Amino acid sequence: MRVAGAAKLVVAVAVFLLTFYVISQVFEIKMDASLGNLFARSALDTAARSTKPPRYKCGISKACPEKHFAFKMASGAANVVGPKICLEDNVLMSGVKNNVGRGINVALANGKTGEVLDTKYFDMWGGDVAPFIEFLKAIQDGTIVLMGTYDDGATKLNDEARRLIADLGSTSITNLGFRDNWVFCGGKGIKTKSPFEQHIKNNKDTNKYEGWPEVVEMEGCIPQKQD
């Protein structure tokens, strides 16, 4: 009886050890697989992050050099979507900010710091050009000036207003007509014509929208004003 009991004990211990061994092996395999999957996912995530294109200020296509301000802007779309003006990753004017309107939309910024100074819009269809002229005359030297049209920005413009905008570096302002789309970035005290300007004429044969041309967009890097 004692021999039989001892034999049963030996068998029970052997079964226990075998079961423990099998379970430990299976668990180790699963652990290895889990760790392998974890490392694989980590490697894939790292690769995805490394291949993701970088984002630059205002969403422009490439980084600006030192001592330059990044900007991006778009004219309005017909009389439905307002213009958008972004400077140094700060949206200065947009429909979402509810500070745009029919006519010419203007944002002013400090040419040394990029700090926004003012944002306004002037109705050039049903409004008066006189306040716009006074606004243009009051702009201080060294100020960055960004402008974009919405709906119609030309009907009420007179020669004086156009001349003042031309003095900011605009070339196309003399030809801006009814419902043209136009974006411009210049500055008070600029000595040459600005390279930052886009203009598309209102033409019934080529208009993207009924009665309005397509949106014009522009981005670039504005040199910081030096002392």
UniProtKB/Swiss-Prot annotation:
One cellular component term from this protein's GO annotations in UniProt: extracellular space
UniProt cross-references to InterPro entries, sorted A to Z: FAM3, ILEI/PANDER_dom, ILEI_FAM3C
PROSITE patterns (UniProt xref): GG_LECTIN
Residue ranges occupied by any GG-type lectin domain in the UniProt entry: 67-225
Molecular function GO terms recorded: carbohydrate binding; cytokine activity
Compartment(s) where it occurs, according to its Swiss-Prot or TrEMBL record: Secreted; Cytoplasmic vesicle
Disulfide bonds: 58-86, 64-221
Distribution of this protein across tissues and organs: Present in most secretory epithelia (at protein level).
GO biological process: epidermal cell differentiation; ERK1 and ERK2 cascade; gene expression; inflammatory response; keratinocyte proliferation; neutrophil differentiation; phosphatidylinositol 3-kinase/protein kinase B signal transduction
Family membership noted in the UniProt record: Belongs to the FAM3 family.
Its job: May be involved in retinal laminar formation. Promotes epithelial to mesenchymal transition.
Protein name: Protein FAM3C
Organism: Homo sapiens
